[in-house]
């Protein structure tokens, strides 16, 4: 009986004053949630889905909605002139349009040729920091699927052709009626290709593709960083049955370097210097990324951790004329395995040292003295 039916507005979870846009939005949301394909094996979902569609079919139509608002479900019972909510071809079209949008099926209509784009491929390549600095052209070999030459990618034996699928008429999809609504599904006979290959090509067993080793040249520009991706258009898997090929993506990683650490376009290195050089000052040579050398001047009294900037000796910036800098951090080495004479000289040096020659140490021990002195005076 009509009295047992749930209110259409409640079914769509909208107010009675809802406009067309609100109705459509509510329908999309609920249809997505309760669609049978998203709830396989759940009979209650199918019932709920039918209720949602019935409610939307009535409320989206101005005349039917007016009749429903006045008479309720009785408006569509026999004797009221409605003959039921009237789910016909118009509903199937509306339903199909909405679900093509929801499930991404719009582009699959009439595909009929069975052509599919080839898959994209990934290739991981490790390069050196020097390669990233100078740039290079590398040769790589990769196994890829290419179009079968025996059948020209059709998948059919030479001298034969694929036949149009009789089940779907070449569309690749079939419509299935379920009660008052229609669902569009992949054709079970041709698996969506739209064609049937009765006599497959022996070289590719009907796939239209074979695997071969391919040698490719990869141009690595200056300034690439760890994780840089290079795209080679059309060098991926061959398309299925004449479809376009996919792309090949080269993912670069930089090997660790024995001397330099990279930070964007800047390079960093750590160089040990002698205690004498640090105390008296001097200079030392450091290597550069272009396999040259440059001199660094060290002022007297240099401490461990001090950094020196060498402008323009870093990495080039990708697709730019800019170049980073190199930063050299010094580490003052404490001498080991001293001779007796060296020990005596250092001991003599220590006796002659004062706060002026070791300001940081003098300042620290002064603070220590003050600290213990203040504790001694505390009652």
UniProtKB/Swiss-Prot annotation:
Cofactor annotation remark: Binds 2 Zn(2+) ions per monomer.
Domain of life the protein comes from: Bacteria
Keywords of this entry: Chaperone, Cytoplasm, DNA replication, Metal-binding, Repeat, Stress response, Zinc, Zinc-finger
Localisation per UniProt entry: Cytoplasm
GO BP terms in the entry: chaperone cofactor-dependent protein refolding; DNA replication; protein refolding; response to heat
The UniProt record lists the keyword Chaperone: yes
Record Pfam families: DnaJ, DnaJ_C, DnaJ_CXXCXGXG
Domain J: 7-72
Binding positions for Zn(2+) 2 per the UniProt entry: 165, 168, 187, 190
Binding-site residues, Zn(2+) 1: 148, 151, 201, 204
GO MF, one example: unfolded protein binding
Principal location class: cytoplasm
Cofactor: Zn(2+)
Ranges: CXXCXGXG motif repeats: 148-155, 165-172, 187-194, 201-208
InterPro entries linked to this entry: DnaJ (IPR012724), DnaJ_C (IPR002939), DnaJ_domain (IPR001623), DnaJ_domain_CS (IPR018253), HSP40/DnaJ_pept-bd (IPR008971), HSP_DnaJ_Cys-rich_dom (IPR001305), HSP_DnaJ_Cys-rich_dom_sf (IPR036410), J_dom_sf (IPR036869)
Family: Belongs to the DnaJ family.
Quaternary state and interactors: Homodimer.
Function in brief: Participates actively in the response to hyperosmotic and heat shock by preventing the aggregation of stress-denatured proteins and by disaggregating proteins, also in an autonomous, DnaK-independent fashion. Unfolded proteins bind initially to DnaJ; upon interaction with the DnaJ-bound protein, DnaK hydrolyzes its bound ATP, resulting in the formation of a stable complex. GrpE releases ADP from DnaK; ATP binding to DnaK triggers the release of the substrate protein, thus completing the reaction cycle.
Domain comment as written in the entry: The J domain is necessary and sufficient to stimulate DnaK ATPase activity. Zinc center 1 plays an important role in the autonomous, DnaK-independent chaperone activity of DnaJ. Zinc center 2 is essential for interaction with DnaK and for DnaJ activity.
NCBIfam families noted in UniProt: DnaJ_bact, PRK10767.1
Protein's name in the database: Chaperone protein DnaJ
Originating species: Rhodopseudomonas palustris (strain HaA2)
């Amino acid at each position: 009986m009509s009295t047992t039916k749930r209110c259409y507005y409640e079914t769509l979870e909208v107010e009675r004053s809802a406009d067309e846009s609100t109705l459509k939005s509510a329908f999309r949301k609920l249809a997505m949630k309760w669609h049978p394909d998203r709830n396989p094996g759940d009979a209650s979902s199918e019932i709920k889905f039918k209720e949602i569609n019935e409610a939307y079919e009535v409320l989206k139509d101005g005349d039917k909605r007016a009749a429903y608002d006045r008479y309720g479900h009785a408006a569509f019972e026999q004797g009221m002139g409605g003959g039921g909510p009237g789910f016909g071809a118009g509903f199937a079209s509306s339903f199909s349009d909405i679900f093509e949008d929801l499930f991404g099926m719009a582009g699959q209509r009439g595909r009929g040729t069975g052509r599919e784009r080839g898959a994209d491929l990934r290739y991981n390549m490790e390069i050196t920091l020097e390669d990233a600095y100078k740039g290079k052209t590398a040769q790589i070999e990769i196994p890829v699927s290419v179009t079968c030459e025996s059948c020209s990618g059709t998948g059919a034996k030479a001298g034969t052709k694929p036949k149009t699928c009789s089940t779907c008429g070449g569309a690749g999809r079939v419509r299935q009626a379920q009660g008052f609504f229609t669902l569009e599904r992949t054709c079970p006979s041709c698996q969506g290709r739209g064609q049937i290959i009765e006599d497959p090509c022996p070289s590719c067993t009907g796939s239209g593709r074979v695997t071969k080793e391919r040698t490719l040249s990869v141009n690595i520009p200056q300034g690439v960083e760890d994780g840089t991706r290079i795209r080679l258009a059309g060098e991926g898997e061959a398309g299925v049955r004449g479809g376009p090929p996919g792309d090949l993506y080269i993912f670069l990683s930089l090997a660790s370097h024995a001397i330099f650490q990279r930070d964007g376009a800047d390079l960093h290195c750590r160089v040990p210097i002698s205690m004498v050089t640090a105390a008296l000052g001097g200079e030392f040579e450091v290597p550069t990324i272009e396999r040259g050398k440059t001199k660094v001047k060290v002022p007297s009294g240099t401490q461990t951790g001090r950094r020196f900037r060498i402008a323009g000796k870093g990495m080039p910036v990708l697709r730019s004329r800019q170049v980073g800098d190199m930063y050299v951090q010094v580490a003052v080495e404490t001498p080991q395995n001293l001779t007796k004479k060296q020990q005596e000289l250092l001991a003599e040096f220590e006796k002659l040292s004062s706060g002026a020659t070791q300001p940081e140490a003098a300042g620290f021990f002064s603070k220590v003295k003050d600290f213990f002195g203040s504790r001694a005076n505390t009652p």
